[in-house]
Every structure is written in structure tokens, then in C-alpha cells.
Amino acid sequence: MKALYPDIITTVGIIFLIILELFLPSFDLIGFLGFLISFISGVLAIKYSLAGYRFNEWLLDINAFSLLLKGVMYILTSFVIFSSVSFFKSKKTFVENVYTFLLISLGLSIMVSSKNLAVILAGLELASISMYISVGMLRDDYISKEASFKYLVLGSMTTAFFGIGSAFYIGATSHLDIISVSVNHNTAFALASLFLFVAFALKVSAAPFHFWTPDAYEGAPTSNTAFISTVPKIGFYAVLFLLASYIFPVTNNFSYIVGIVGVISMFWGNLVAYAQNSAKRMLAYSSIGHAGYFLIGFSRYNPLSVSSTIFYVIVYAFATAGAFLVLSILEKNQSWTHDMSNYRALYKRSPFLATALALFLFALIGIPPFATFVGKLGIFLGLVNSNAWFFAILFVIGSIIAAGYYLKLIVYMFFKEPATKDNMSLSLNLFDTIGISAFLIIVFFFGIFPNILFDIILKDMFHG
């Protein structure tokens, strides 16, 4: 029963914050309590994961692996809330932003708590609806509202694909439990696999299902982009792991479809990123490229490949959230835009922010000593061990191509002269510094000591 405590605490906390906000609509108070609720839930989830707790009743199947993912999502949520409160206040966004983040995390937590398609859909819808709202949280901002509507329209296709896939799944198996797959390779089951995969490919921004991503990421408040581009990805890839574990192996050659979509996404995201003049849109296409890396990792179901992919997803989430949060700090200065020209000589105006953003970009490239390097190396070795040389070679080529557009922004920050002589001062408070430093420490720490996290993932995924 203790395995349910993190979700119970979050649920009660959300209800409390909704009531409290009616009487005390203070960003500082609601933000602090939101941070506390999410952080406590995350710590408890990781504690129970390490203790091997399990709950397997009422269509739920909470084990050590799902508890680990819950813990990571809740802690990452708490970090983003902590780092975003000053941005919320500067942009006069809605106080509801805080518990919208908690609602998304709760939906994702429900989603990874079950191997039943009905429960997964319930969690998916709670998270998705809250994400649509989160994108449109900027007051009196047409672009934000337009981005939210586009995300709603295209994101709703996920529900349609998921529902169709579930219908075919019931027709093929007569139940909704993913773990009870024992059917022949019939057409209905193959279609179920295809539609379920497309549903989550759309959610993780994999090409050619990525069209909502650039507009949603650019139109959302930047701190909200930091959240929706990272925390949900952990939950969605966890479900893709379940599909890769139980459904895809039963369908002949389906792993090749996953791998090919991954290759398309990797090259499309990384190549189109070069054409972007906005740092925010560039990072949006970076997420599309990374979706390709992750899908290629899942395309070969072996312990090293899939555990490396989950490890990579987790550390990528911290690196990407950190990068977007640096952008949100810059955006608090009212005249700031994310055009590349504004990043010229950023190092002279704010050495800390320029250095932090450069380190996050190096982490996204995937070079040592950052934790993302370990994830990429593990995926590559997993592909080699599976004799998937075609995907392994393309994986390396895609990673090399991606380095260029990250380095382009770094060159602008450190080696380009400003476009104007206007030496705009950039504000930076203590909470900004602490928040960004926390993300940097995590990305560095698990790069130097990867086994601490990697061994837990490997053990929980295949023995939890």
C-alpha cells in the first residue's frame, strides 16, 4: 500500500492548492507548497523503489521500476517549479500554473502505474489536457493561445489513435492487459501495435508526427516549455518500453518500423534545427532529433539498449529543462527575444548564464563527462550487440550532425560581437542560480558516476 503514497500525497496536495488559491493567490506561497508536495512525493517514490515495494491490485501494477520513474518525474517537477516562480511573476501568468504541473505529473504517474490500456488512457488524458492548458498560460498573448489550440487539435489525435489501437487489441486478445499477450501474429494485433505506437510517437514528437512541437514549445511560457519538453517524455517513453517489452516482440518485424521512424525523426529534427533563427525553436527541433535517438534505442529489445535509453531519457530531461530555464531567465528581461542575434556576446553580459547554457548544450551533444554521453554510448553498444549495424552507424552520423547547431549558439554567446552597442543588463536572483546549478550538478554527477542510476534502472526494468 505504501507504493501508493506518492500519488496520494500529490492528489491531496493538488486539491489543497486549488482551495488555497481561492483565498491566497500568492505565487510565492503556492509555488513553495507545490515544490514541497512534488519533492516529498519524489523522494518517497525513490525510497520505496529502492526498498522494492510493489502494489498489484485494482488494475494497477506499481513495481520498483515504475516507482523509480515516478520519483524522477516528481523531483524534476519540483525543480522546475522552484526555478520558475520568479518567471511566472514577471510574466504575470496564472497562479494555476503551479498545480497544472502537478496535475501533469500525476497523470503521468498513473500512466506508468499500470499495464492495462484503460488505466494508461486515463493517465494519458489527465496529463494531456493539463499540458494543453499549460501551453496557453500567458495572459493576453495571442501566440500562446494559438499554440495551445494547435497542440489541442493535433494532440487529440493521440486519443484517437490510442482508442483505435485499443479496439484492435481487444479484438485480438479479448482483454486490455498488456502483459497477457499470447496470440498469433494476426492482422488485428499488428494494427493494434501500429496504432498504439503512432499514438505515443505523436506524444514524444517523433517525425512525421511532430508538427505540433515547434509552435507549442515557442508559444508556451518558456518555463512551461522546460516542463512539457521533459517530464512528460519520461512517462511516455516508459509506456513505449512496456509496448516494446510485451506487444512489439509478438508482431513480426515491428522493431524495424520503430527504428525507421527513429531514423527519420533523428535526421529531420537535426537538419531542420540548422535553419532556425530562434534558440527556442532550435531546441524544439532538438527534441525531435532526440526522439529519434530514443526510438532507435527501443528498436532493439535487449537489456543494454533499452536500459541505456531510459537512462538517456532521464538525464536528457534534466539537461533540456536546464537549457530552457536559462532561456526563461533571459526572457524575464522585457526586451529580450530568443532570436540568435540576441545571444551575441551573452558571456559579457552574464557569464553565469552563458556558461550554464553552453554546458547544457554540450550535454545535449552527448560528450563526456556529461551523463548524456553514457546514454548515447550505451545505446550504440546495445545496437552493436544486436548486430544492428545499419542503425548503429546512422545513430553516430545523426549525433555528429546535431553537434553543429548546438555549437552555433555557443559561438554566438562567446565569440560574436553584439549586434548593437546596447549593453542590456540581465537580472539573476538567488533562486535562479540555485535552480540552474542543481540541474548542472545532476547532469555532471551521473556522467561521472553513471552506475549509481544505471544499475538501478537495469535491475528494476528486468527484475523489478
From Swiss-Prot:
A biological-process GO annotation: ATP synthesis coupled electron transport
Protein name as it appears in the record: NADH-quinone oxidoreductase subunit N 2
Membrane topology note: Multi-pass membrane protein
Membrane-spanning intervals of the chain: 12-32, 33-53, 62-82, 93-113, 117-137, 152-172, 189-209, 227-247, 254-274, 282-304, 310-330, 351-371, 400-420, 434-454
Name of the gene this protein is made from: nuoN2
Main location: membrane
Subunit structure comment from the entry: NDH-1 is composed of 14 different subunits. Subunits NuoA, H, J, K, L, M, N constitute the membrane sector of the complex.
Assigned EC number: 7.1.1.-
Gene Ontology CC: plasma membrane
Keyword annotations from UniProtKB, A to Z: Cell inner membrane, Cell membrane, Membrane, NAD, Quinone, Translocase, Transmembrane, Transmembrane helix, Transport, Ubiquinone
Task of the protein: NDH-1 shuttles electrons from NADH, via FMN and iron-sulfur (Fe-S) centers, to quinones in the respiratory chain. The immediate electron acceptor for the enzyme in this species is believed to be ubiquinone. Couples the redox reaction to proton translocation (for every two electrons transferred, four hydrogen ions are translocated across the cytoplasmic membrane), and thus conserves the redox energy in a proton gradient.
Pfam family, one: Proton_antipo_M
